[in-house]
């Protein structure tokens, strides 16, 4: 093969993974079509996971196809791209041309979704190119048209004309939308096509390019047969949703011709749309759209792709047409089928019309094509057509032939008819056209798609050349490309020439049935056969219907839509019979308005039949199938018309009866799996005259040859006479009884019984449906096989099926034709499955239960409802299951399946042999009775009541009373489950004394009248269920699964639980029962017991929790009490492993951790309701005095623990408690209940209808002065874009952002359109969406009680949003570098630099009442001094007027000491310093910390720290103390340490200090159970002085990991301890401290000699905690790491010692629950201390200002107070965080991050760390520093 240039095609080879083979196979045809290459796959060796692909074609094409396939098989990106929905036509219009061109250009895999959505996949470069092209397309959408007088306007006019011509060539239902696009968009689309076509001729390129497989079926057919001379033309304009042929095929058909095909093809298009035809085309389309509504058809993607690239297309499809159709030399026939929306799956395309003329308007390759269009000389024909007919109104248009003088030699008689076309059901798969060997089977059939029920009324215009010998219109079919000249399509006729129209239709039929050599394709639009009497031959003109053909490969075609419009009555004529007035039309659906009729179709003469009988009125609402061969018979005329031999027809009637009798002898006609082909109505060449559509025989009389001469009454005669009685199925709209079962009707059985086993009487089905509808049933389903819907004269009154299908009550089972035999799917399977899944009954007379397997035989037998007909009455028995069974009322009522199905299951189980083989034998204790085998159960069951044996008969009253007792299973007073039930549900062997059971309540089934726990089953049923052993054979397992499957609705995760057992059923010969099957078996039984025994929790009642902990197991039960009884809610039991001493858990039943575990385990059931604890004690083997004493102590502890657990706020600590905090020690508000200020923008919203306000703020420092501003960029649907820039008060960047939002709210508060605010700052989005509602609830206060910044602005925003209805929307844009984001950022910078207007809060804005309430109490300065013995002695000396005796640190400064006269405080007055307070010993270190480590000092040097501390107080040796503290500060290293400098690790504590945190003990425990986060070890940290213990999970067990935990949670607040004991040894402790210095950035680290590292001799301080930790990890399993705070809470509550805060301050301060839950104890105590120090500093500053003697001293005091407040960090400030190393690297600063909440001066909650865009963890200020201030403009809202 050579290419056009004579070059051989290039080949590309590359490998593809085998897993991508299905994807490549699906896209192979599309790749070949778009890239015009040949794709061949070669399988590699079987052991290799890949295969080879060969691409053959032009080098450029193969390269592009290779890149496309790479992205298809291994997509680097696969995302959804959104665009305005108005551009949806650009991707689906022009028959997918633009989408394919875009795929060619970008090499991306494109899948159009709903309007406004496009899935783009492939390589990154392809995705980016597609995204850029879409952005340009969207941008051009907003370009308006240029004035015509400008060069741009002239250019756009030319572009519009060229685009219109291209759209006309590739016309489809999106043509109107495409022509309404702006010229700029059209230009971009044309450029896309031009680039894809390259240098190739556009028409030839379009022919090669083909039709897209992603768009609906192309709806244009151009058939061209050129001759040497051009003269008169035959133009047939008709709607054709049928087969298609690409324009490119015409080029290949005319390669031997000297003239190009493009000219002719384009010319035919121009003929149909001349300038005067523009208005007529609009009118035609408008009339059409009004009548057909949204009824559409579609062709699937696969079918279209296969059709375009099939092997048949590789041949020349037009050569056979040109050879068979011998057209006269002086004529040229051009068939142009007007594009309509009959095949589209979407709404009708909009009315459109191209430009007035197509001229040489656009340069390039397309211009040449459009120039050829204007060269044609056929415009006169289209103009004459528009002037002759289409300008008249619909009801005034002529219907007779119109003589027009055209450019040809002969005048053309023109006949126009507008007729109603109706939808018909799917064609039968048994028709010859759909046979595998048939002609039509070679093509891909049209795919079915659902359509509305509004009937389609389509205008059909036909122009026939004169002189053809046709006097009347005779079934004008569709000219099909590639079909035989005499072939009749599935419903249409192809005419070869004028003479062919004169031939009888029977010849065409026989030719078609005999098979055609040409390739045929099914047509979706066909004429409809008339309704004909069985005794007559000739029919009147019938109507035209649409039909769809399913693909031959499909086994179950989709259900068709059935029309509701009224049809004309069937009227029969005889050549010699006189004319009589026509019978009135009898509507089938009165509620449906009658469609307008043409004048000639309103009245039709009616005649008598041969027997002299009156032809009955019939309803012709019919269903057409694919079995009919000819859709339309020639119209009968009083002047001329073909005659048919009546005797021949009558003989055929008798033959059909004989064949029916033969079928009856062979088997029941309604149930034939394989049926002979003789039943297919294709026996005679006149068969099309007699059958037509399904239902053509309804209402007609069947007369045998002997009926004319005898008066014998037959059953068939009585049946036909009964059909004369009108019957209308009237289904009222009254609501039915929801307590009735679903009715599944066997349509074949009912129809054949009513039709005397000879006719398929649809009236019988309608009677059955009407009967059950009147009884109150609303869930009715009728099953009918597909082959019963084909055109068969035995099918009567099929309009009933039409109505049932429209009401969604008819289900059609699939069937097919194989070698002339009907193969019908076993429709019993469908009926049984539906009845099983919906608990319905089956209405049938067939004994289908004998055909079912054992698992469903019993169920089916009890669901069959027999019936019969008594004349016109449908009757069912009153005792469907026999006289001993339930009544009809009970049978049709939804039963409580529990009692009945359990009884049935037990009855079957009793008949099975005993089972002995199981993995774990179920046994009782030694003294218990052995379990009964099934035989014993059966004998005992015979003596029991009839509840199990006969579910329909009630038991005696006393038994009913016992069975309905809700607690009969457990006994009246027994609070627990029976031992038998528990033992049969345990995964462990019950003989070991431990059970592993977990029973939780299930959701009540919506299919039952009463909830599952409304009526407890009898105790006997549960006892027998508990005794069922594990099944040991296939039969027992089948029964068990059948029983469980009937209760699958109440078993959660049923499919997962039953999966192993399903797999075992498939291994019937290889029965291997293993542990997995046993677990599945027990899990299913456990789930069913939960449904039987557990009650639904009542949220209005308290819960009772009982926990029992023995040495080997933990048992917990949850129940509620009402009506004097206990109702179990949940139950759990699990084995426990013994500890090292083999004594079980810590203290038996009083284990607080067991209670905590049980409470958390039942949290889903308990919710927020109160829980009453009922604890049990387990017996001990030996009880010594110490244990007894500890038991008494633990009992007192249990009292406190129970009170703790009953506190609702404490139990909610398991949740994420950061949001919704109301205040100190108050309940938490869930986020869902907080009133929102904004609402999120719904996904897939159309922003074109919103007022879009893009906001941004900007802030920078200029000459140490803060400048701020913001910008607004507004897009409105009613006005052009607006850009605004403002300057605002110099606050922070957060204030600038919020001011932008407030300004936008002010401007659009009264807008009629919804408003959406768009921001690319994640912090502002979080503030507006999450934090602002929380701040409003908390009174605009932070967690430490301080006022939030800018409360007036926050309150102003809330007040503005309250005036919106609905609330304004908010949306966070993901792309910061987008055009709108850059624009609004530029506006914000312009405003900050003073280039915009000034904005400030209105003066009348009310200021919210914000009352800061600092944490802690006001410190007593005198009491603090008196707590220091040295200061108390000095105060006493001064009060007594004495001097110090003996050595004292205050001896040298005693003369500077004095007492304040007002307060009695000890004060110090130094030289050149103001008078200050003397600091007691216990507060000196903390006072230095508050100055040095807090944001006020930010780890300043020695001098600055000393000056600041000197303003707050004095003590002897103060300067040395400050120097030692600064030298030992670890966190000054990353700020002040110079590279290479030595860092000595020192402790700020004295050598023999007994203060808290000065002496620590650490131990690493593990490895333990791996947590979900991957933690394997636990670090225990204990304070030997305060007995404080805490645990931290560790992932890596390294020195650096331990150092990191200590730095963040202990050392950051309390410094390095003077004494560090490690259980791993002194060397481990030394390495930990060295790692601290190295982690913080020190190059060389040494340890001070003062530090002590003794060996840990005793772990008494945390021995109890370590013991509890092991038990806690075992109870919580893999979730222990996330639940450690619960252990801390429980252990802290049990301690009686004073807390560190009490040791330091002598008081206790309450904290909010989130702090207790999320923070370590060291940080919690540090938080308390920070609150105390803050109050202390404020009190000291007030004291010093009051005692100041000079004005300068007061000024210095106020300056320090003001600077300290300004330097404090607040919410919204930006900081940098010191990220500690994790893999041995040094620490580094990260950020900036926003402060989301302030807990104290040294503890903050950071937003965005460690989880982006979320309120993160608590961080100490020692590991934070302020974001640097720059002199140059710098945006402070930089994200991390």
Curated annotation (Swiss-Prot):
Source organism: Mus musculus (Mouse)
InterPro entries, sorted: DNA/RNA_pol_sf, Integrase_cat-core, Integrase_H2C2, KH_N4BP1_1st, KH_N4BP1_2nd, Rev_trsase/Diguanyl_cyclase, RNase_Zc3h12_NYN, RNaseH-like_sf
Protein name in UniProt: Protein NYNRIN
Biased composition annotated in UniProt, kind: Basic and acidic residues: 284-294
Record has Transmembrane helix as a keyword: yes
Misc. comment: The gene encoding this protein may have arisen from the fusion of a cellular gene with retroviral sequences prior to the marsupial-eutherian split. Sequence and structural analyses suggest that the integrase catalytic domain is inactive.
CDD domains cross-referenced by the UniProt entry: KH-I_N4BP1_like_rpt1, KH-I_NYNRIN_like, PIN_N4BP1-like
GO molecular function: nucleic acid binding; RNA-DNA hybrid ribonuclease activity
């Amino acid at each position: 093969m050579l290419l056009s240039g004579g070059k051989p095609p290039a080949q590309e080879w590359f490998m593809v993974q085998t897993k991508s083979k299905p994807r490549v196979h699906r896209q192979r045809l599309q790749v070949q079509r778009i890239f015009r290459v040949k794709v061949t796959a070669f399988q590699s060796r079987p052991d290799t996971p890949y295969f080879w692909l060969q691409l053959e074609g032009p080098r450029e094409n193969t390269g592009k196809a290779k890149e496309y396939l790479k992205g298809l098989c291994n997509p680097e990106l696969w995302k959804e791209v959104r665009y305005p929905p108005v551009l949806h036509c650009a991707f689906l219009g022009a028959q997918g041309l633009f989408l394919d061109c875009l795929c060619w250009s970008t090499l991306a895999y494109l899948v159009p979704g709903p309007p406004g959505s496009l899935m783009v996949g492939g390589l990154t470069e392809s995705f980016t190119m597609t995204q850029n092209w879409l952005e340009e397309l969207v941008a051009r959408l907003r370009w308006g048209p240029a004035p015509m007088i400008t060069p741009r306007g002239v250019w756009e006019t030319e572009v519009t004309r060229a685009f219109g011509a291209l759209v006309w060539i590739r016309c489809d239902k999106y043509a109107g939308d495409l022509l309404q696009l702006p010229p700029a968009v059209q230009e971009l689309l044309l450029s896309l096509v031009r680039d894809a076509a390259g240098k190739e001729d556009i028409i030839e390129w379009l022919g090669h390019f083909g039709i897209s497989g992603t768009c609906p079926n192309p709806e244009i057919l151009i058939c061209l047969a050129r001759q040497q001379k051009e003269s008169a033309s035959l133009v047939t304009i008709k709607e054709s949703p049928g087969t298609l042929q690409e324009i490119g095929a015409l080029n290949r058909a005319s390669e031997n011709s000297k003239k190009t095909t493009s000219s002719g093809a384009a010319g035919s298009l121009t003929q149909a749309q001349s300038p005067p035809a523009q208005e007529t085309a609009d009118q035609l389309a408008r009339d059409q759209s009004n009548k057909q509504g949204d009824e559409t058809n579609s062709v699937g993607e696969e079918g279209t792709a296969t059709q375009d690239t099939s092997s048949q297309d590789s041949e020349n499809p037009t050569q056979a047409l040109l050879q068979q159709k011998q057209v006269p030399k002086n004529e040229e026939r051009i068939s142009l089928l007007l594009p309509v929306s009959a095949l589209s799956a979407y709404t009708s395309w909009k009315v459109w019309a191209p430009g007035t003329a197509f001229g040489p308007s656009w340069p390039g390759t397309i211009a040449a094509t459009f120039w050829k269009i204007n060269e044609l000389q056929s415009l006169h024909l289209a103009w004459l057509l528009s002037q002759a007919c289409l300008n008249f109104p619909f009801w005034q248009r002529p219907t007779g032939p119109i003589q027009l003088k055209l450019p040809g030699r002969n005048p053309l008689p023109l006949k126009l008819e507008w007729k109603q076309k109706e939808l018909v059901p799917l064609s039968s798969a048994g028709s010859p056209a759909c046979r595998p060997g048939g002609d039509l089977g070679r093509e891909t059939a049209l795919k079915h798609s659902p359509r509305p029920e509004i009937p389609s009324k389509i205008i059909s215009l036909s122009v026939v050349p004169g002189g053809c010998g046709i006097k009347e219109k005779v079934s004008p079919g569709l000219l099909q490309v590639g079909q035989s000249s005499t072939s009749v399509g599935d419903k249409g006729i192809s005419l070869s020439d004028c003479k062919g129209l004169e031939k009888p239709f029977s010849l065409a039929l026989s030719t078609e049935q005999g098979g055609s050599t040409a390739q045929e394709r099914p047509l979706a639009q066909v004429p409809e056969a008339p309704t004909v009497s069985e005794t007559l031959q000739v029919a009147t003109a019938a109507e035209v219907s649409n039909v769809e053909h399913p693909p031959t490969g499909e086994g179950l075609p989709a259900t068709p839509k059935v029309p509701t419009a009224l049809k004309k009555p069937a009227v029969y004529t005889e050549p010699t019979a006189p004319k009589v007035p026509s019978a009135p039309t009898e509507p089938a659906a009165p509620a449906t308005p009658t469609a307008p009729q043409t004048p000639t179709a309103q009245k039709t003469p009616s005649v008598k039949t041969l027997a002299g009988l009156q032809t009955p009125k019939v309803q012709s609402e019919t269903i057409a199938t694919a079995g009919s061969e000819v859709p339309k018979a020639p119209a009968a005329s009083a002047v001329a018309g073909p005659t048919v031999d009546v005797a021949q027809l009558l003989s055929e009637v008798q033959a059909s009866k004989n064949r029916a009798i033969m079928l009856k002898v062979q088997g029941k006609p309604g149930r034939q799996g394989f049926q002979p082909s003789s039943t297919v109505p294709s026996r005679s060449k006149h068969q099309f005259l007699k059958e037509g559509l399904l239902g053509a025989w309804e209402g007609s009389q069947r007369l045998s040859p002997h009926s004319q001469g005898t008066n014998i009454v037959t059953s068939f005669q009585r049946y036909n006479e009964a059909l004369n009685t009108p019957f209308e199925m009237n289904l009222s709209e009254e609501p039915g009884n929801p307590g009735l079962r679903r009715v599944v009707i066997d349509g074949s059985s009912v129809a054949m019984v009513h039709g005397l086993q000879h006719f398929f009487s649809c009236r019988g089905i309608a009677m059955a449906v009407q009967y059950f509808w009147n009884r109150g049933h609303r869930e009715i389903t009728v099953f009918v096989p597909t082959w019963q819907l084909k055109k068969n004269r035995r099918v009567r009154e099929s309009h009933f099926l039409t109505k049932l299908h429209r009401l969604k009550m008819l289900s059609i089972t699939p069937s097919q034709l194989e070698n002339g035999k009907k193969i019908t799917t076993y429709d019993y399977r469908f009926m049984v499955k539906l009845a099983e899944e919906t608990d319905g009954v089956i209405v049938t007379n067939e004994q289908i239960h004998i055909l079912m397997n054992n698992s469903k035989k019993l169920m089916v037998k009890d669901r069959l409802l027999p019936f019969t007909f008594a004349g016109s009455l449908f009757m069912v028995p009153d005792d469907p299951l026999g006289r001993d069974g339930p009544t009809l009322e009970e049978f049709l009522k939804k039963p409580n399946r529990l009692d009945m199905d359990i009884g049935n299951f037990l009855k079957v189980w009793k008949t099975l042999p005993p089972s002995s083989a199981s993995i774990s034998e179920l046994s009782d204790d030694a003294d218990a009775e052995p379990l009964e085998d099934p035989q014993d159960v059966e004998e005992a069951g015979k003596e029991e009541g009839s509840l199990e044996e006969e579910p329909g008969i009630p038991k005696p009253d006393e038994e009913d009373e016992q069975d309905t007792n809700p607690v009969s299973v457990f006994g009246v007073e027994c609070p627990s489950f029976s031992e038998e039930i528990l033992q049969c549900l345990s995964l462990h062997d019950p003989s070991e004394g431990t059970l592993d059971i977990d029973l939780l309540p299930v959701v009540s089934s919506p299919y039952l009248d009463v909830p599952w726990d409304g009526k407890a089953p009898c105790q006997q049923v549960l006892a027998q269920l508990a005794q069922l052993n594990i099944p040991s054979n296939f039969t027992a397992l089948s029964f068990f699964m059948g029983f469980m499957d009937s209760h699958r609705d109440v078993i959660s995760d049923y499919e997962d639980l039953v999966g192993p057992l399903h797999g075992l059923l498939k291994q019937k010969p290889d029965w291997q029962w293993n542990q997995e099957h046993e677990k599945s078996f027990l899990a299913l039984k456990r789930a069913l017991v939960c449904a039987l025994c557990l009650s639904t929790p009542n949220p209005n009642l308290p819960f009772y929790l009982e926990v029992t902990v023995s040495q080997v197991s933990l048992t917990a039960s949850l129940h509620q009490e009402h009506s004097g009884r206990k109702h179990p809610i949940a139950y759990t039991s699990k084995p426990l492993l013994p500890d090292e001493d083999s004594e079980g858990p810590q203290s038996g039943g009083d284990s607080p951790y067991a209670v905590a575990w049980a409470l958390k385990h039942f949290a889903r059931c308990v919710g927020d309701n109160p829980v009453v604890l009922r604890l049990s004690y387990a017996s001990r083997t030996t009880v010594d005095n110490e244990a007894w004493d500890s038991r008494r102590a633990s009992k007192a502890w249990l009292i406190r623990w129970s009170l703790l657990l009953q506190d609702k706020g404490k139990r909610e600590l398991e949740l994420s408690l950061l949001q919704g905090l109301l205040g100190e020690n108050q309940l938490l508000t869930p986020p869902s209940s907080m009133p929102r200020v904004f609402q999120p923008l719904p996904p897939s919203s159309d922003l074109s209808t919103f007022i879009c306000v893009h906001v941004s703020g900007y802030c920078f420092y200029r000459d140490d002065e803060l400048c701020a501003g913001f910008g607004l960029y507004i897009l409105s649907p009613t006005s052009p874009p607006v850009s605004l820039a403002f300057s605002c008060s110099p606050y922070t960047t957060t204030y600038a952002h919020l001011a932008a939002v407030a300004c936008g709210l002010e401007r659009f508060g009264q807008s009629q359109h919804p408003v959406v605010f768009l921001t690319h700052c994640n912090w502002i989005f979080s503030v507006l969406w999450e934090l602002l509602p929380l701040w409003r609830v908390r009174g605009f206060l932070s967690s430490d009680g301080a006022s939030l910044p800018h409360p007036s602005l926050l309150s102003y925003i809330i007040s503005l949003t309250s005036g919106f209805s609905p609330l304004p929307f908010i949306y966070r844009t993901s792309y910061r570098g987008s055009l709108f984001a850059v624009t609004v950022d530029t506006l914000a910078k312009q405003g900050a630099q003073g280039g915009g207007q000034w904005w400030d809060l209105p003066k009348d804005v009310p200021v919210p009442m914000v009352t800061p309430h600092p944490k802690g109490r006001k410190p007593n300065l005198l009491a603090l001094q008196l707590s220091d013995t040295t200061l108390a002695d000095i105060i006493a000396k001064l009060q007594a007027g004495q001097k110090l005796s003996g050595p004292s640190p205050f001896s040298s400064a005693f003369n500077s000491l004095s007492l304040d006269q007002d307060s009695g405080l000890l004060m110090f007055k130094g030289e050149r310093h103001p008078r200050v307070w003397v600091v007691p010993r216990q507060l000196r270190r903390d006072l230095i910390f508050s100055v040095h480590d807090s944001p006020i000092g930010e780890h300043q040097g020695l001098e600055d720290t000393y000056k600041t501390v000197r303003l707050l107080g004095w003590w002897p040796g103060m300067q040395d103390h400050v120097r030692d503290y600064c030298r030992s500060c670890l966190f000054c290293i990353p700020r002040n340490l110079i590279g290479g400098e030595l860092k000595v690790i020192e402790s700020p504590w004295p050598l023999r200090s007994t203060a808290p945190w000065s002496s620590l003990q650490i131990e690493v425990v593990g490895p333990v159970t791996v947590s979900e986060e991957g933690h394997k070890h636990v670090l225990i940290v204990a304070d030997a002085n305060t007995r404080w213990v805490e645990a931290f999970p560790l992932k890596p067990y390294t020195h650096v990991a331990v150092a990191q935990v200590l730095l963040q949670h202990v050392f950051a607040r309390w410094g390095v301890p003077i004494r560090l004991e490690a259980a791993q040894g002194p060397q481990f402790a030394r390495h930990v401290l060295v790692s601290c210095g190295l982690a913080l950035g020190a190059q060389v680290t040494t340890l001070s000699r003062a530090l002590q590292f003794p060996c840990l001799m005793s772990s008494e301080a945390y021995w109890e905690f370590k013991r509890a930790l092991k038990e806690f990890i075992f109870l919580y399993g893999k979730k222990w790491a996330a639940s450690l705070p619960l252990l801390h809470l429980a252990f802290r509550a049990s301690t009686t010692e004073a807390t560190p805060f009490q040791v330091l301050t002598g008081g206790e301060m309450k904290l909010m629950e989130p702090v207790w839950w999320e923070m370590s104890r060291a940080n919690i105590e540090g938080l308390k201390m920070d609150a105390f120090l803050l109050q202390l500093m404020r009190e000291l500053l007030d004291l010093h200002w009051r005692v100041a003697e000079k004005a300068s001293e007061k000024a210095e005091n106020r300056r320090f107070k003001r600077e300290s407040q300004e330097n404090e960090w607040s919410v919204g400030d930006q900081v940098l965080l010191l990220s500690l190393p994790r893999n041995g690297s040094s620490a580094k600063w990260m950020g900036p991050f926003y402060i989301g909440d302030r807990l104290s001066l040294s503890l903050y909650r950071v937003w965005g760390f460690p989880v982006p865009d979320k309120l993160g963890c608590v961080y100490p200020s020692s590991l934070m520093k302020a974001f640097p201030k720059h002199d140059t403009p710098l945006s402070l809202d930089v994200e991390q």
